[in-house]
């Protein structure tokens, strides 16, 4: 099964930022082909240092030892480890003035919104956050 998640939530809505990565990791662990496409405020999570500073405060945000609260970046790394692919909207990256060296290493690629539209039409499911 092919699943695409459109991630428009970002630093302005921190309480919405963990669940997409958590759900993506669960789906990938169950052999789904999962991509997350970042756009709008979600694109800001791709800048180095941003996601590390956001703690969503949801019940699933405790680390495995139950002590440290997980950051959004921890959830991004978990999803990446599960096999989730990360892509961003080129127009959003350009409008924020981000350069390749500004972006987290987990990002797999940047392409225009038109490519997202084509991928979304081919996917079995599209989720938006």
Regions found by a protein language model. Give the residues of each.
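Short internal beta-strands
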Residues: 34-40, 86-90
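A glycine-rich helix N-cap at a beta->alpha junction
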Residues: 54-87
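N-terminal beta-loop-helix "entrance" segment that forms/cooperates
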Residues: 42-55
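Anion (oxyanion) recognition and catalysis
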Residues: 28-29, 80, 120-121
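Short, glycine-rich nucleotide/cofactor-binding loops
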Residues: 5-18, 46, 64
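Short, basic, glycine/proline-bearing loop/turn elements
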Residues: 7-10, 56-64, 98-103
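Ligand-binding beta-strand-loop-alpha-helix segment within the catalytic cores
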Residues: 77-80, 85-91, 98-100, 105-107
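Histidine-anchored nucleotide/phosphate-binding helix
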Residues: 17-30, 36
């Amino acid at each position: 099964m092919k699943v695409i998640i459109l991630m428009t939530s970002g630093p302005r809505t921190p309480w919405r930022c963990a669940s997409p990565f958590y759900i993506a990791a669960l789906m990938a662990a169950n052999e789904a082909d999962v991509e997350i496409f970042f756009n709008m405020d979600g694109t800001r999570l791709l800048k180095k240092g941003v996601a590390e500073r956001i703690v969503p405060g949801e019940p699933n945000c405790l680390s495995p030892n139950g002590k440290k609260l997980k950051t959004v970046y921890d959830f991004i790394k978990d999803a990446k480890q599960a096999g989730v692919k990360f892509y961003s909207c080129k127009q959003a990256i350009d409008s924020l003035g981000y350069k390749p060296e500004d972006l987290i290493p987990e990002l797999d690629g940047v392409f225009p919104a038109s490519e997202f539209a084509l991928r979304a039409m081919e996917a079995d499911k599209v989720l938006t956050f």
